[in-house]
Design a protein with these regions (language model features):
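Charge-dense, helix-prone N-terminal extensions
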Residues: 1-181
Length: 181
């Protein structure tokens, strides 16, 4: 019930911010649509997305925080509920989504953690994603059904991350006023 689907606030801009960018290319190469909680009230909340490039497209579920320390709340929830976490990971696999972490801690932060959850405990952010280079599919109505099914199957992961995110808000780790920069 907190998901924002207003296209004015959920779709990327075509113009690129060229400040501090040497290339000064005016337009983006990729475009995206995000389905997420309202950014000003829920900064850094997990989200579903669909994106496309000139030669590929993809979709998935992601959770990135601008405070790396905030992501430890996700790790804590994984440790507290490893069965629920692994069920959510399996749900994402069933949806055809692949796990990826853009940044990881080099040091083992949880040396006593069970082996099956260890790969996820070094992540500073996470996503489960799908990519395709078959651009003929992008104009197909069946892609919408595919997205709906994948996002529905991945719902346990979104719920898991939303619980971790709500813990961050409750503990004051992430504050809505921090989003206004």
């Amino acid at each position: 019930d907190k998901m924002l689907t207003d296209p004015v606030r959920s779709v990327s801009r075509i113009y690129r911010d060229t400040r501090g960018n040497r290339s000064k290319i005016k337009y983006r190469e990729n475009m995206w649509l995000m389905l997420r909680r309202y950014k000003k009230e829920y900064p850094s909340a997990p989200f579903f997305y669909f994106e496309f490039y000139p030669n590929s497209f993809g979709y998935g579920l992601a959770f990135w925080t601008w405070k790396q320390s905030a992501f430890k709340e996700v790790h804590n929830l994984i440790i507290e509920h490893p069965g629920r976490w692994l069920d959510a990971v399996d749900a994402c696999k069933q949806a055809g989504l692949t796990y990826n972490a853009r940044d990881n801690y080099k040091k083992d932060m949880y040396p006593d953690a069970p082996k099956e959850i260890k790969p996820y405990l070094s992540a500073k952010n996470m996503e489960f994603s799908y990519s395709s280079f078959d651009m003929n599919r992008i104009n197909s109505p069946s892609l919408i059904d595919e997205l709906k099914l994948a996002f529905d199957l991945a719902r346990p992961m979104y719920s898991f991350w939303a619980d971790a995110y709500d813990n961050m808000l409750d503990k004051g780790i992430i504050k809505p006023e921090d989003a206004i920069r």
